[in-house]
């Protein structure tokens, strides 16, 4: 029955870094996107 315990022993708890390449890529796209969506939404009221 030690075979069922083996996968649980292999899992080790990691503290993942916040600033990763994925984080930079996501925010480099997300922040301007939210800004432009807000700007486009604001333009709708400039009539």
From Swiss-Prot:
This b-type cytochrome is tightly associated with the reaction center of photosystem II (PSII). PSII is a light-driven water:plastoquinone oxidoreductase that uses light energy to abstract electrons from H(2)O, generating O(2) and a proton gradient subsequently used for ATP formation. It consists of a core antenna complex that captures photons, and an electron transfer chain that converts photonic excitation into a charge separation. The gene is psbF. The keyword Transport applies. The chain crosses the membrane at residues 23-39. This is Cytochrome b559 subunit beta. The lineage of its organism: Bacteria, Bacillati, Cyanobacteriota, Cyanophyceae, Synechococcales. Its cofactor is heme b. Belongs to the PsbE/PsbF family. InterPro entries: PSII_cyt_b559_bsu, PSII_cyt_b559_CS, PSII_cyt_b559_N. Heme binds at residue 27. Pfam families: Cytochrom_B559 (PF00283). PROSITE patterns: CYTOCHROME_B559. HAMAP family: PSII_PsbF. Its main location: membrane. It comes from the Bacteria.
């Amino acid at each position: 029955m030690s075979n069922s315990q083996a996968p649980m022993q292999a899992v080790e708890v990691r503290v993942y870094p916040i600033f990763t390449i994925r984080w930079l890529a996501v925010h480099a796209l997300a922040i301007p996107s939210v800004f432009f969506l807000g700007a486009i939404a604001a333009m709708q009221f400039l009539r």
